[in-house]
Every structure is written in structure tokens, then in C-alpha cells.
Amino acid sequence: MSPDRTNVTSDQAVAVGVDIGATAIKAAFVGVSGTLVESFHQPSPRTPAALHDFVHLVLRQAKTQLRGIGIGCKGIIDTATSRVTSLPGDLHFLEGRLLADVIDPAGLPLYADNDARTALISEVLWGAARGKRNVVLLTLGTGVGGAVLVDGAILRGASGAAGHLGHMTLDLNGGLCICGNRGCLETRFSSRAIESDYLAHLHRAAPTKLSLGKAGELPSTEAIFHAAAEGDESARCVLDRALEYLTGAVVSVLHIFDPEVLIIGGNIAEAGAQLLTPIRDAVAHRTRILLGREIPIAFQGLVGYGGVAGAAGLVFLQQRLLKI
């Protein structure tokens, strides 16, 4: 577990934010102003006991009284009980469990929500969407996540599944998604999808500057973007096709929710203008007639710690120390 420290004034309320990801778990003490007091990270737990032990190791580092624990986790979360109702993939061991029971929060209030929603909370409270009341956040990484704020309220839906934008159907005959559907956005634009599509190009012996690693590992999405920027035709072909699906999905989302701003986050956002320019071009040409305005598109402001900050933000919102 690796800590990082910054300063926070002694009169600030402080909460613990925990972000449970597929490959890493992060935690931080966060002040009500959004200041990161101290942060921790390690590879993701693979058992309930490992999750419990990590959180309690963090709690023992507290230097001040804590207002509570906020949890951001993939999957569908019952916010009233902290139950993980659906969670396929590497964190499946949490499915059906109450996070409050797994973590045993030592008398502290515990609040939980989907990790894309906690990322959205951090942007609305302290980041690129500060002060906005209608926001869509799209996270692009190994998978595709999403969260939506409408008139100051986070959309959760009847079963807590609202905002799972990565599971919009874009291709009725597309590949099978982990959700059981076919042709989801996540199967067309995600690190998994881009790297798999690039592998198919390698198997067809298409001209390319990249190759498989010594152990047969795929070129990373970052490397594919870099190769495309340097003129690699295979990389450019893969990304052009993936971006067609992404821009189509973005245009649909903007027509449905009519946000003040669209926030793009996740590891793929590091591609910068290669990602943002085609999205902005598509939005400018395909939404202006109906929406009558240009919708700002911005990258996530709290890069690297939005998940833990937003998880702590759950505590501050629930205890009415902050409001959206």
C-alpha cells in the first residue's frame, strides 16, 4: 500500500473515500473542500477479507476524526443498503454482499454507489462540472462507464442501473458483452475492444508498426493511439472505426439528456485531442439543429483521484455538509 500526503486545514471535515477498481483499489482521506489529505493504493482485492483488511489498514492511519466512509464500486449498487446487486468480472466475489458487512466500518457511517457516479460527484463538487446541474460523464477505459445528473439529481433508476452508458446497443449483430447483450458500446469502444480489433488486423497480416509482445501480449490502447498519430494505417483504421461508434453514442446521449457539459474520463482520455477532436466535430454537426447550441465537452478535471474524492463526497452530501 503506497501513501501520498498533502496538507489540509485542521477545521475541515474529513471523510474516507474508497474506489474499488478491477485492477487497483484506492483510498484517501479527503477534506470537504476536495483536498486530498493522504492517499493509498494497491492491487484490487480478490476476496472480501482482503477488501476489509485494506480499508481497516487505511482507517488506522487517520490523524483526525472522520465523518464516514464512502465507497465507489463497479456494478449496480443499492445505495440504501450498500448491497452489490450485480457485478460481473474480477470483482464478482462482492455480488450479493452488503459492503457495510464486508468492510465492518467500525462505527462510522458508510455510503456506497457505482464508481462512475462517484466520479461524477467529484466533478460536480470540485472539478470540470462545478456548479452545473445537468451533466453527463462518460468513462472510457477497460470498459465504458457513465453517470448522469439531471436538474441537480443523480439518475439511479428503479434498480440502480441508470447511466450504464457502456451498454447502449450500437450493433444488433455485434459481439457478446459481459452484460449478456450484443453490440454494446463497450464491445466497440473500450481498451478491450480496441486491442482485440487490432489483434485481428495483425492476424490478417495488415501493414503495421506494432507487434505482439514477447509473451504474446497485445499492444496497449495507448500504443495504438500513438501509432495512429505516426501514420500507422492499421492503427488508424481500428481507431476510426471505434470512434464512429463512440461519436454515434455520444450524439445519442446528448439528444437524450441535453446536458450543460459532457465530461470524458478514464484512461483512454489520455489520448487528448485524438479523442476529443472527432467527438467535438461529430457533436457540432449532428446535434446543433435539435439542441440549438454547442455543448461543451471537457476532460475530467480530477484526474487520478476523482473516484476517491467523489466517494468521500458521498459522505459530505449525505450529511448535508455539501450540496449539488
Where are these regions (language model features)?
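Short glycine-rich, Thr/Ser-proximal phosphate-binding strand/loop in the N-terminal lobe
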Residues: S2-D53, R83-S86, G160
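Glycine-rich phosphate-binding loop plus the immediately following alpha-helix
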Residues: I25, P105-L108, A112-A116, L170-A205
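Glycine-rich phosphate-binding/hydrolytic loop that grips phosphoryl groups
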Residues: V30, D113-V124, E270-I324
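N-terminal phosphate-binding loop and adjacent alpha-helix
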Residues: T35-Q65, E230-E233, C237
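Glycine-rich phosphate-binding loop and adjoining helix at the ATP-binding site
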Residues: P43-H56, G68-I69, I76-V136, A273-R286
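Phosphate/pyrophosphate-binding loops at sites that engage ATP/ADP/AMP, CoA/4′-phosphopantetheine
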Residues: D53-I69, L108-L110, A128, T208, ...
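Glycine-rich phosphate-binding loop of actin/hexokinase-like ATP-binding domains
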Residues: K132-F189
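A mobile "lid/hinge" subdomain adjacent to the ATP/sugar-phosphate binding pocket shared
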Residues: E186-I263, P296
